[in-house]
Regions:
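Extended basic (Lys/Arg/His-rich) segments that typically form rRNA-contacting surfaces
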Residues: 1-224
Length: 224
């Protein structure tokens, strides 16, 4: 498994050798610094902690700075842990760049969806409006009946309702990498990824076998 931290730059399009337009999301991937290395002997599993994006020291707490100073790493805004196949080969202070992936790799991209604030059931869950005529009632954007009265005298869990919409962790699986620019630390993946421009994303090797989504392609039983 390979992984890297990045930021969503935006969407664009690339033409393949047949002139077909491929919608892609451009991600600024890395460079990331190995901040901590976890081993089976000490922690019970193999993993590395990556740090991404330099920030001023004054923006971190003393415990955070102590953790980074112990590793001899400059202040980082984001720290994330990954279970990597080559964790034993990496050492604290090593740099992970976009070229850890190559064109044709399949990845899972995790991000935070856009926030939409407090929304009603129609926008949040796609509920149907009540009739606007023929006795449709005084309100037309409510959820309608939520269940019985005396029995069970409560609303079952899972019923839709108004509330905060968005700002959820979302993972899009089996996106293939169309292009990698190692000099600019940019990765272009086919399709859309969660979050706004500038949003933090985690790119990891896909964990599932899959069927390639686009046309004129075969089936991959072991993508990595």
């Amino acid at each position: 498994m390979k992984a890297i931290i990045g930021k969503k730059v935006g969407m664009s399009q690339i033409f393949d050798e047949n002139g077909k337009v491929i919608p892609v999301t451009v991600i600024e991937a890395g460079p990331c610094t190995v901040v901590q290395k976890k081993t089976s002997d000490k922690e019970g599993y193999e993993a590395v902690q990556l740090g991404y994006e330099d920030i001023p020291e004054r923006k971190l707490s003393k415990p955070e700075m102590g953790h980074l100073n112990k590793a001899g790493v400059a202040p980082k805004k984001y720290l994330r842990e990954f279970n990597l196949d080559n964790a034993a080969e990496l050492n604290v202070g090593d740099i992970v760049k976009a070229d850890t992936f190559k064109e044709g790799d399949f990845v899972d991209v995790t991000g935070t969806s856009k926030g939409h604030g407090y929304q009603g059931v129609i926008k949040r869950w796609g509920a149907q409006r009540t009739p606007t005529s023929h006795g449709g009632g005084p309100v037309h954007r409510h959820a309608g009946s939520m269940g019985s009265t005396t029995d069970p005298s409560r609303i079952f869990k899972g019923k839709i309702g108004a509330g905060q919409m968005g700002v959820d962790q979302v993972t899009i699986q089996n996106l293939d990498i169309v292009k990698v620019d190692a000099d600019l630390n940019l990765i272009a993946v086919r399709g859309a990824v969660p979050g706004p421009k500038g949003g933090l994303v985690l790119i990891k090797s896909t964990v599932k076998t899959h069927r390639v989504k686009h046309a004129d392609s075969g089936i991959s039983n072991n993508p990595q």
